[in-house]
Amino acid sequence: LSVNKISFLNIVLVVVVTILAYPIILLLNGLFLNAISKVVEFNNFSQDLFTKSSFSTYLLFACLVPSICEEIFFRGMILNAYDIYGRKFAILLSSFIFAMSHFDIQNFVAPFLLGILFANLMELTGSIYAPIISHFTNNIIAILGAKFLTDNFSSIFSSSNLAKSIGSPE
């Protein structure tokens, strides 16, 4: 586990890279969802959490806690455990396991790509803090975007219409 300090400049770079990567990952995820929507029915897996929790509680449990816990586990432990098979393999495997831990085919591509991003940020900075900050930044963009860019906060999570429409060629 690389608990090295991270410079302010690296923090800023991590946040900027994450913000710039977000629309690209969203587009790729949308393309994937658009393709599989023809054969797979999507779930409403997050709707209850939105409707039964306060926004601040949701921010805590969707942004802060996963950022810390998931990054310590996936980048701090899994990535480093499989490093003996080569760094690229370890990055891909830890990213695959990270994506699978998100429980659903409709939520596979984005976490997989984010896992690769998080692992590379850790590699570049030498610190677990980089993927934690990136993960938090990504999650808060997603939550705030869902809250402020849609009329109905829970509707974005009760269907995958936004992600599918972003990836739709129509």
Kindly give the residue locations of the regions a language model identified.
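Membrane-water interface at transmembrane helix exits
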Residues: I25, N29, L33, C69-E70, ...
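Juxtamembrane helix-boundary/capping and inter-helix hinge elements in multi-pass membrane proteins
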Residues: I6, S37-K38, Y82-K88, G126
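Juxtamembrane helix-loop-helix connectors linking adjacent transmembrane helices
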Residues: S2-C69
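Residue-level signature of the transmembrane alpha-helical core
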Residues: I11, V15, I19, L59-L64, ...
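Functionally important transmembrane alpha-helices
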Residues: M100, N107-P169
